[in-house]
Every structure is written in C-alpha cells, then in structure tokens.
Regions:
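Detector for short helical micro-motifs
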Residues: 1-90
C-alpha cells in the first residue's frame, strides 16, 4: 500500500458531472473501487477478488465495472482496470 492507509478525495467531485450523474448505487461502487485501487497502487484486483472484498456477487461487480468504465471513471490498461487519472489524483 503506497503512502499510508488513506486516499485523496477532492472537493472538485461536487462539480464533476461524471461523478454527480452517477446513481447512488454506482457512487458507492466508485468510492469502494477507488479504495481497492489504493491498496494495489491504482490497479484493480480481478473481479472475483473485488466481489469478495466488497461482499458482492461477481455478476454485480462486473456490471458495476462496465457501468463505471462507460461513464469514463475507469480506464482499461494493459495491466487491467485503473481509476481514470489515478496518477494525477493520488
């Protein structure tokens, strides 16, 4: 875990349409996902591990990842999924 057991959450999300247009459920997914990303230097774990850590089904986890990727909040990289602009924000 890089730089301690915390992550940055910027007040700018109040005016970010990508964030503010999320459903309450997807906002919760997004917050939990960025917490998981922090534990792995920005990269998300495999779906099976994410589902277990978040106490969700693999199906619901996959759907949430698809939704957040479509919203522009997750990027597909050659190493896996990563929150958009992770390096700039963390």
């Amino acid at each position: 875990m890089a730089n301690g057991p915390w992550l940055r959450l910027y007040t700018e999300i109040l005016d970010n349409p990508k964030i503010q247009l999320l459903s309450d459920t997807n906002f919760r997914w997004w917050v939990n996902i960025i917490c998981l990303a922090k534990l792995r230097d920005g990269l998300l774990p495999p779906v099976k591990e994410m589902a277990w850590r978040l106490r969700q089904s693999e199906r619901d986890t996959s759907r949430a990842l698809e939704s957040l990727t479509a919203a522009g909040l997750l990027d597909v990289t050659d190493k896996g999924l990563k929150p958009h602009d992770w390096g700039a924000h963390q």
